[in-house]
């Protein structure tokens, strides 16, 4: 009974005793969740349009951020550097389509997955060769002043990050569901050959979706880089995005943001209220335990589609 009280009663009593502190923990979790969601969005876009799990998305986040901060270090103004970084990610999409995807059409998913692993190592190595491997501070002018509302401490950077993530999700949801290009992307994901037979240009569609994923990676890189500096550990954020995808569903854009928020808030609450009771570092494994529970009881995720195949 004592163990039950310690694990399942005491933490909730602590939350009730200090609602202001609880609110700060939740807000901190929301920021982290938005950051996870931005990375997960890149995975969703490519998987939704091509059925490929792009292991290189984390490396794309790193490469986009390295390109931006590298240009700024060489004296390029912020807005010009942003524009050039977008151009670089579009060029990357063209190169990926021309030299990788075009030669792997209709191959097994595992082959495409292995190809993206190779792409991840290529981007990391090329980024290190061109821009160096040291940690680079990134400042694009996003304010980071703190202020209080109702006793709750807020940060302007957190609000900008949350607003950017929400706006990006809304734009992408409209793009996929209400535009001709978006519908073509979904058609390609369902059946490459059928899409080609009705005149949908597969090469163009893949360039578009990888370009958009690159732009999403740039936004994620800006947020993560502004918070903790642009460093090569950014590429490992892909591992944290995987539980987000499992929770939200691999094909759901809203699911990416909801899954990210659940994991971000859950991590912070678990670390603050349960960490002192059962040991620290819960933040490092909480997301994976939650993802495992979803794989056991709801493998398609909160917003994913259950796939039924007749044999």
Annotate the PLM regions.
Residues 36, 40, 76-87, 207-217, ...:
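Transmembrane alpha-helical segments in multi-pass inner-membrane proteins
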Residues 1-39, 67, 75-81, 107-112, ...:
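Membrane-interfacial amphipathic/re-entrant helices at transmembrane-helix boundaries
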Residues 43, 76-119, 126, 258-263, ...:
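Alpha-helical transmembrane segments within multi-pass membrane transporters and channels
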Residues 40-49, 68, 92-98, 119, ...:
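Alpha-helical transmembrane segments of polytopic integral membrane proteins
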Residues 14, 27, 49-95, 99, ...:
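Membrane-embedded helix boundary and interhelical linker motif in transport proteins
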Residues 32, 153-233, 253-259:
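Helix-loop-helix "hairpin" substructures at the membrane interface of multi-pass membrane proteins
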Residues 3, 12-15, 103-178, 205, ...:
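Transmembrane helix-bundle core of multi-pass membrane transporters
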Residues 65-69, 86-92, 117-126, 164-173, ...:
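Hydrophobic core segments of alpha-helical transmembrane domains in multi-pass membrane transport
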